[in-house]
A protein has these predicted regions:
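Alpha-helix boundary/capping residues
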Residues: 34, 92, 133-136
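Ferredoxin-reductase
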Residues: 41-117
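Generic, ordered loop/turn and secondary-structure boundary motif
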Residues: 9-10, 15-19, 23, 80, ...
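An N-terminal, well-structured beta->alpha segment
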Residues: 1-65, 69-71, 149-172
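Short, surface-exposed, polar/charged, turn-prone segments marking secondary-structure boundaries
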Residues: 36-37, 73-76, 103, 124-130, ...
Length: 179
């Protein structure tokens, strides 16, 4: 049985303090639970993205390791905005996406938002992941799933630009101010 801080499993995401309740080891277990859940629902591929928090690269690697151990293929789209993970999951036909983000929380926090096979995981679905981790109830693949990186930025921008139809020429002024 795995010991894990149950309080990090919130109603609509998983989040905790980096290095305390949320470590790379914990994130790898979460990856195993998510990979197992995707497989149960008929999925074979999960897109992962992350924000710019310092723990993001290590957490992305750990998450991917856990998912791959179940046989799920991982597409890592790197540092992106959360909507880009959801876009990539649909655009690539994966139907599953996981965003590693601390959102509005202080810098020492990080977290995970999840969509598996088109369903945003929340409430009991998140508690089900916790139960799977506690019971060590994971799919174990004969061979690990694949891993690839992909830059989805141009496809995302082209989709947005393609969706906008102007009836007249637009003039825009922008002041970037402090960044």
């Amino acid at each position: 049985m795995n010991t894990i801080a149950s309080e990090i499993f919130k109603a609509y995401d998983i989040r905790g303090i980096v290095g305390k309740s949320l470590t790379a080891e914990v994130v790898e277990l979460i990856g195993k639970a998510l990979g197992t859940e995707a497989i149960k629902r008929g999925g074979t591929e999960i897109v992962i993205g992350r924000d710019g928090r310092l723990s993001g690269p290590d957490f992305a690697k750990a998450l991917a390791r856990g998912m791959q151990s179940t046989g799920v293929h991982v597409v890592d789209i790197g540092v992106v905005a959360t909507p880009m993970v959801y876009f990539a999951a649909i655009e690539l036909g994966a139907r599953s996406g996981v965003m590693i983000t601390g959102s509005h929380n202080p810098p020492d926090y990080n977290g995970i938002k999840m969509v598996i096979e088109g369903e945003t995981l929340a409430l009991d679905a998140i508690q089900s992941l916790l139960r799977a981790i506690q019971a060590n109830d994971f799919t174990v693949a004969a061979s690990p799933g694949g891993y690839r990186t992909l830059n989805i930025n141009d496809r995302y921008v082209n989709r947005i630009v393609g969706d906008v139809k102007l009836t007249r020429k637009m003039k825009i002024a922008m002041d970037c101010g402090n960044g």
